[in-house]
Design a protein with these regions (language model features):
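An N-terminal, well-structured beta->alpha segment
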Residues: 7-104, 110
Length: 112
């Protein structure tokens, strides 16, 4: 898939209308191709301190879509490892933490 295809797919499935609109704006402006490349050059990776990155639109930034996908993956794995898993979610004062907390809680709740 091209960067454009990945970005279009991302915007179509982004649960946050603001970040989805930002990606669509990037796609419409050829002068911002480098920024589009930066945001879609590969997914944000889970490191020793968890998911960390600049908050913003795209697969390589912290946003609700990344939190949704990561939480879904965690719950899928955890559900195969433990019967009736329990999960604790925390948040802090960093920008977006409360929204990310709520998003993770919604995914966990939907997973049962």
């Amino acid at each position: 898939m091209s960067i454009t295809d990945v970005a279009c797919d991302w915007a179509a499935h982004d649960p946050d209308p603001e970040t989805a609109a930002y990606v669509l704006d990037l796609l419409e402006d050829p002068a911002r191709a480098a920024e589009l490349q930066s945001r879609f050059s590969g997914p944000l990776t889970f490191g020793t301190a968890g998911l960390r990155g600049e908050v913003g639109a795209g697969e390589s930034r912290m946003n609700r879509a990344v939190v949704t996908r990561a939480t879904y993956g965690l719950m899928d794995w955890l559900g195969r490892q433990v019967e009736g898993p329990r999960v604790v979610i925390g948040c802090d004062a960093r920008h977006g933490s409360s929204d990310f907390y709520t998003t993770a809680a919604e995914v966990i709740s939907a997973a049962g």
